[in-house]
């Protein structure tokens, strides 16, 4: 199913354990509904039992926040798909409004967090390589990403201040670069 495919893409990504548990409960609920509609469906009892066991075997979420570009994009797509399922109430398992909102906020913040770690690492690498224009792009991306969160989340506010300092370093480097080009052309 679509839900099983989402779960299959989760290993190694920082998806909150609550999201995986919710999706596994949804699979269980769908199997129970199938059993009610088709009680003689071959193997349904075993499928339900396997789904129940899977709920109890959800592992804590990955602590990994330093994702390479492809994994970051995969994580971003996956978390947006889960958020969409929650927002559009596509799950068979009932989810209260407060739990839905908490989980969607947690998924969104996790996207911001992983993107921040990726972008700051890329910007630092580019600064060391004197690729300041590319580093400036990452700075701009991070400012846009973090600014909305910086007002309501202390961690994001700290990251935002760190990004502003990094942007200042890049800007100073670009000014120095422009001045040295200007003086060498005289």
Each model region followed by its residue ranges:
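Hydrophobic/aromatic side-chain positions at a characteristic register within alpha-helices
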Residues: 7, 67-70, 74, 115, ...
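Helix-turn-helix repeat elements of alpha-solenoid scaffolds
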Residues: 16-26, 90-98, 139-140
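Soluble C-terminal extramembrane regulatory/interaction domains of multi-pass membrane proteins
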Residues: 90-134
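Inward-facing hydrophobic residues that define packing positions of alpha-helical scaffold repeats
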Residues: 24-27, 79-82, 86, 127, ...
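N-terminal topogenic membrane-targeting module
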Residues: 1-70
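TPR/TPR-like alpha-solenoid helical repeat scaffolds
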Residues: 44-59, 98-109, 152-177
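Short, charge-rich, low-complexity alpha-helical interaction segments
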Residues: 70-103
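Alpha-helical oligomerization segments
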Residues: 119, 123-186
């Amino acid at each position: 199913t679509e839900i099983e495919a989402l779960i299959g893409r989760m290993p190694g990504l920082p998806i909150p354990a609550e999201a995986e548990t919710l999706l596994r409960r949804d699979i269980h609920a769908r199997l129970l509904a199938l059993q009610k509609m088709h009680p003689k469906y071959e193997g349904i009892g075993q499928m339900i039992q396997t789904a129940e066991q899977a709920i109890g075997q959800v592992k804590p979420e990955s602590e990994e926040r330093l994702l390479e570009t492809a994994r970051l994009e995969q994580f971003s797509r996956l978390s947006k798909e889960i958020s969409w399922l929650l927002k559009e109430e596509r799950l068979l398992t009932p989810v209260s409004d407060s739990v839905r909102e908490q989980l969607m906020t947690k998924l969104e913040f996790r996207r911001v967090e992983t993107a921040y770690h990726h972008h700051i690492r890329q910007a630092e690498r580019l600064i060391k390589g004197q690729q300041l224009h590319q580093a400036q792009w990452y700075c701009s991306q991070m400012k846009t990403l973090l600014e909305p969160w910086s007002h309501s989340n202390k961690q994001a506010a700290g990251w935002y201040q760190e990004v502003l300092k990094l942007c200042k370093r890049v800007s100073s480097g670009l000014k120095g670069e422009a001045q040295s080009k200007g003086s060498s052309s005289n």
